């Protein structure tokens, strides 16, 4: 296996990185994982140590000596993109707006477009009523708090962490 990444990354790297991240994001097993434990659990070929190094460099995990755990942004991204079965109506609504706003900003960034103002976001969703605007504004605040978007001077853009998560989780 190659030790150096190409600018686009290797398919083998993306496969093991995704497998390691999915293991850490599994709702039933979210806890710190030892490097050896990850290697024993995964059936995907590849270098777990290098995968953990790449994931840490992308700020998708945290490391303490031999232990690794998914970063808050990765956990929140995973929560947002999961089905909403069994959630309360208010949680379902929150998740809907979080997902819609994040997908809009990710699509914009994939197309090479720059940041979007709050007004442009409202217009993109056809938010003419105050209630809808507040829901979008709250979603922007939650996404910023989770580290999935960056906001400066009233403009929002998907963070590098969110772009990398989107790239990894949609192979």
Q: Language-model features: where?
A:
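Short, cationic-aromatic polyanion-contact patches
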Residues: 10-17, 66-86, 154-171
């Amino acid at each position: 296996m190659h030790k150096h990444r190409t600018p686009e990354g290797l398919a083998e790297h993306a496969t093991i990185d995704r497998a390691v991240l999915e293991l850490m994001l599994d709702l039933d097993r979210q806890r710190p994982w030892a490097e050896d434990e990850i290697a024993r659990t995964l059936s995907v070929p590849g270098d777990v140590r290098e995968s953990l190094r790449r994931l840490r460099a992308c700020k998708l995990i945290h490391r303490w000596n031999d232990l690794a755990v998914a970063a808050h942004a990765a956990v929140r991204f995973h929560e947002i993109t999961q089905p909403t079965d069994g959630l309360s109506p208010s949680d379902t609504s929150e998740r809907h707006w979080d997902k819609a706003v994040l997908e809009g900003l990710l699509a914009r960034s994939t197309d090479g477009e720059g940041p979007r103002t709050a007004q442009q976001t409202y217009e993109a969703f056809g938010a003419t009523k105050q209630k809808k605007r507040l829901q979008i504004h709250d979603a922007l605040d939650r996404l910023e708090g989770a580290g999935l978007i960056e906001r400066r001077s009233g403009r929002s853009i998907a963070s590098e962490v969110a772009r990398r998560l989107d790239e990894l989780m949609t192979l």
